[in-house]
């Protein structure tokens, strides 16, 4: 019996391309509508997102629109939680599609596993050609290092999960989302869950699809910001980064540093060429064995997507060191 009330929290901003399909997927959820509330927190969209949401909210009383005048995701999530009345919180993203049993499976596995945060693997799907290439990069070990939450068949405990679901009281007790974190807010929350003895569980029974950025320039901006705010996360918690998080930064420093030194030294020029050649061979190999793409031209574009992810994240990581390392970043106790 699904008698517990569930609040679905959805941050939105200029999502007119995706919002209608997303809202329809919410209407198709098999969780009883009398025990469901859907809170769409809008960052003052300038496209037709708000109009579309309002038209649905007028028809369906369990949907409501909340304004987020501060625009960014972490504020939206906390506003949603503060305006919620459910025993459970399920976070969703409008840039995605969800299976009909998504909410009910989240609640089922929260009960079954006694984990503090439960979700499914991040399955990335594209609509346009470029989106499909970028989606393939998410499943490429060379691009993201094979993170467990990007593996479609992974089930078990992990250090993070996209979106997630929680008991509301627990989420409030650990301080909800850190409003100083416009990026990496999920990682920060999951770190605090683990720090407080909680567990994070992923199961492929919880099914969804995420739509990635539509252009390489948007992908660059996204991963640059991830790199910047990863430093804030490291600084806040005093947690040493994984070796894999250093690799993009080392690659960028190598490209720029050895590239400049190659003008003054033949030895550095040869090392620079050798390094780029090795990177290109590895990128070529992992791109061309990727089964998500078929055509040679798409696999070549995948090489470019991998490169964009590496350079943008590495450059952001370096920028984050300059931005945060000498600043008085406050450490939270929650």
Give the role of each language-model region.
Residues 4-7, 37, 188:
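Cell-envelope/extracellular polymer assembly enzymes that use nucleotide-activated donors
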Residues 100-132, 136, 207, 211:
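Conserved donor NDP-sugar-binding/catalytic core segment of glycosyltransferases
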Residues 250-327:
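Membrane-embedded multi-pass helical conduit in multi-pass membrane proteins
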């Amino acid at each position: 019996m699904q008698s517990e009330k569930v609040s679905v929290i959805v941050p939105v901003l200029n999502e007119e391309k995706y919002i209608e399909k997303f809202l329809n997927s919410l209407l198709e959820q098999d969780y009883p509508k009398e025990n469901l509330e859907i809170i769409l927190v809008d960052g003052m969209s300038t496209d037709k997102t708000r109009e579309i949401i309002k038209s649905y909210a007028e028809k369906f009383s369990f949907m409501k629109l909340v304004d987020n005048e501060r625009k960014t995701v972490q504020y939206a999530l906390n506003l949603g939680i503060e305006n919620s009345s459910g025993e459970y919180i399920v976070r969703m993203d409008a840039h995605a599609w969800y299976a009909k049993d998504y909410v009910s499976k989240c609640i089922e596995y929260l009960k079954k596993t006694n984990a503090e945060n439960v979700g499914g693997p991040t399955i990335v799907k594209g609509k346009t050609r470029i989106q499909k290439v970028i989606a393939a990069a998410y499943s490429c070990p060379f691009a993201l290092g094979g993170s467990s939450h990007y593996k479609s068949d992974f089930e078990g405990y992990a250090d993070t999960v996209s979106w997630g679901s929680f008991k509301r009281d627990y989420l409030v007790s650990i301080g909800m989302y850190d409003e100083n974190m416009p990026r990496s807010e999920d990682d920060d929350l999951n770190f605090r869950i683990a720090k407080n003895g909680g567990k994070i569980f992923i199961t492929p029974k919880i099914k969804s699809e995420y739509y990635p950025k539509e252009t390489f320039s948007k992908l660059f901006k996204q991963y640059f910001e991830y790199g910047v705010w990863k430093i804030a996360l490291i600084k806040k918690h005093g947690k040493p980064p994984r070796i894999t998080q250093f690799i993009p930064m080392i690659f960028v420093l190598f490209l720029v540093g050895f590239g400049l030194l190659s003008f003054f030294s033949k030895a550095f020029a040869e090392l620079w060429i050798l390094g780029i050649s090795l990177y290109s061979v590895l990128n070529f190999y992992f791109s061309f064995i990727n089964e998500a793409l078929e055509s040679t031209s798409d696999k070549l574009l995948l090489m470019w997507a991998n490169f964009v992810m590496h350079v943008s994240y590495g450059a952001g990581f370096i920028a984050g060191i300059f931005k945060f390392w000498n600043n008085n970043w406050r450490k939270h106790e929650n």
